């Protein structure tokens, strides 16, 4: 009895220990089952992804490639990440004691990669659903898609594509639950417990970040669309709310410019925007240069010298024509096609990809003004309306998205530009190689193929030099040998205009247009044949002596020098006698007459006024055509021979030297003093 009484307390104390061990065993069993569930479901999940990426996507080739890219998004990247993730999970099966801790470490290791790939897929999920709804409106297409899905994944049922597309979203949200289940069956004092806690928290953060990213993309998607609206459509969108919003923003901006309120500074974003604008400028410049290159290439291909008949039956010219024909029909056309497909089209796509970020940056500035106004009100009042809070969140979402993605975008654009430039250089190198290969056969038949390259270069330079000298001599000959001047009749009603030009510039500056002139530049004149002009300068601003600056009496501009000839306006003796008389009729200017017959009576030289001149100051004297004058000095006080000091009717003054002429007049019989 005593012995039995001694054993009874020990049996009661052993019962709790057995219950504790049994509880630990149950927790360990549940823990292992949770780990097994994680691995098994990961295997099934990865298999389903592979079916979508391989079997289903390959059978939906009748859909546009753009639709397939939206439907399956970056599913290939998800498969790559989850394949490595599953491999590491399966490796832990051989280490049962450390398996739970290893699982937690694996989740921590893949945290960033999982977030990067799944946030892209989740952000495009709504667009994929819109496409699925569009397909449902086309019964024949919907039946075709449904048949493919049911053949590959029978358990999809009537949901079809929607059942498959939602699987990645369900999986990323289930990871924290699976980890939480493992954590609940882990004793707190175990070494794996804190690791699992960090893993659960990390996966919850991943889902939170994905939701925030998705929200930012939804906000940004409203402003990245480039709409081509007409003026009427833009005006139709204007309402009182729009006017009020834009007026408030303008007021906020003016206050900042005036220094009344501070401007929000964001050095990080400003640096990223500056970098983006520089990258955009590089893309634009390269696109313009490639466009000009393609235009020049097209002009080069339009010129086909091999199609011209040179009337040369044989020799190097025929060989060159054969080579040129071969290059034009094959090498150059293929080069142009490759250039358009591998350089021009990617460059246009790159330029188009810049439009979305550009619109987003512009919209961020508008939202920044709204944000600053709301912040001011929040400091003053302490509360804001729901719409103001939404505007505040919109700016924060846009700013966070740009700061997060602009660095990657700028880097990708620069890499794309580098690849385009490398492709362009490679195409040029391939073209040069093809031309050399095709020319080798023809070069062997040319007369100087055995000459070394330096000597051949010298030979070509000498030949080109001789040809250039010949062309230059021909040009000089044609410039020197001009047709004899012909007298062009004055245009009707131009006498007064000619008189004005004479009184202003003198006869030595007057020229007549020999043929119609059609101006092509902004400063070129269009003049009819026979027009009288005054030369202002015998060259243009670039020093080209082939273009003269002239004055028509109303307009000034440039005309070709080769279409002008000096206009001689010396009046005849009969006209001089008539002008010297009492006849006050208007005087007509005529070209220089042929030499008069020798008079039968003695004559003497007399200086007369060839043209009328009106004095413009007290230092000048007026003249009448045919009026005799006395030259006192053949130059002015500065020695300028263009002005002469004369005496007329007892008055002295300066007149243009070009307005004076010597005329022969009969002398009276008798003695005369020598002049």
Swiss-Prot record:
Q: Which organism is it from?
A: Homo sapiens
State the residue spans of region: Disordered: 1-26
The UniProt gene name for this protein comes to: ARHGEF37
Outline the extent of the BAR domain.
Answer: 254-455
InterPro entries (alphabetical) = AH/BAR_dom_sf, ARHGEF37_SH3_2, ARHGEF37_SH3_C1, BAR_dom, DBL_dom_sf, DH_dom, Dynamin-Rho_GEF, SH3-like_dom_sf
Q: Which UniProt keywords apply?
A: Guanine-nucleotide releasing factor, Repeat, SH3 domain
**Xref: SMART domains:** BAR (SM00721), RhoGEF (SM00325), SH3 (SM00326)
CDD domains in the record:
BAR_DNMBP, RhoGEF, SH3_ARHGEF37_C1, SH3_ARHGEF37_C2
Q: Where is the DH domain?
A: 30-213
Q: Where is the SH3 domain?
A: 506-569, 602-665
What name appears for this protein in its UniProt entry? Rho guanine nucleotide exchange factor 37
Q: Gene3D superfamilies given for it?
A: Arfaptin homology (AH) domain/BAR domain (1.20.1270.60), Dbl homology (DH) domain (1.20.900.10), SH3 Domains (2.30.30.40)
Which lineage ranks, top first, belong to the organism behind this chain? Eukaryota, Metazoa, Chordata, Craniata, Vertebrata
Specify whether Disulfide bond is a keyword of the entry: no
